[in-house]
């Protein structure tokens, strides 16, 4: 299923000022590794901004939570500590249910359906973000999600008590319904959490599996 979307956010005031100001330098925190396709896409965005502004707006990309951790990025942009950032917005669904619009299981099960869902939600999402002083710049869907475990899973009983990495309210609820223990872990911390046993299972895309070399810690997808 297509279960989550990563968004690029900026402060409305700074975005408006950036077009007129010369030689602006911005920081853009991203939660994912440098070779993750969301980060690669963000770098293409940064390069395009530099080109179309003739170098008057130069954005430095900070990958893998190196400037701000994933759960700090949205707030950092709101407070002006970062002028722009990319964030998995469904992680903030507890703040406003609109932010979790794309995390309902099986609501969108293809990229086309994900695009349609994004378009349907855009107006309401923009309104909520604007009220917080934020502007939505672009959104990118993740590939289909799957469950990663370190053992065969034949029934719900096999999942009982497993520490499960959750990244939003929906994945925490999935864990609870399956009898697992939801544990909030950001993407940049996932590899260490798996290696140290802080979590022993999670739901994510094949892209994340490659980023984190999950086969070194888990055995079943």
Describe each PLM feature range:
Residues 10, 23-113, 127-221:
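N-terminal secretory/targeting leader peptides
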Residues 17-19:
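N-terminal signal peptide c-region/cleavage motif recognized by signal peptidases
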Residues 115-127:
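Signature of the catalytic double-stranded beta-helix
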């Amino acid at each position: 299923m297509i279960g989550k979307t990563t968004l690029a956010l900026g402060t409305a005031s700074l975005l408006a000022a950036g077009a007129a100001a010369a030689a602006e330098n911005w920081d853009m925190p991203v939660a994912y590794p440098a070779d993750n396709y969301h980060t690669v896409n963000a770098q293409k965005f940064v390069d395009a901004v530099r080109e179309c502004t003739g170098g008057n707006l130069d954005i430095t990309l900070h990958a893998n939570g190196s400037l701000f951790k994933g759960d700090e990025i949205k707030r950092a942009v709101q407070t002006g500590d970062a002028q722009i950032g990319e964030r998995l917005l469904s992680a903030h669904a507890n703040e406003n249910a609109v932010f979790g619009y794309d995390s309902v299981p099986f609501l969108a099960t293809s990229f086309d359906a994900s695009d349609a869902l994004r378009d349907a939600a855009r107006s309401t999402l923009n309104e909520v973000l604007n009220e917080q002083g934020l502007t939505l710049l672009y959104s990118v869907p993740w590939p289909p999600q799957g469950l990663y475990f370190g053992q065969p899973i034949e029934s719900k009983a096999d999942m009982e008590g497993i520490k499960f990495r959750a990244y939003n309210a929906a994945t925490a609820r999935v864990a609870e319904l399956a009898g697992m223990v939801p544990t909030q872990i950001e993407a940049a911390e996932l590899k260490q959490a798996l290696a140290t046993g802080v979590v022993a299972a999670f739901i994510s895309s094949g892209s994340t599996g490659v980023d984190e070399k999950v086969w070194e810690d888990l055995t079943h997808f």
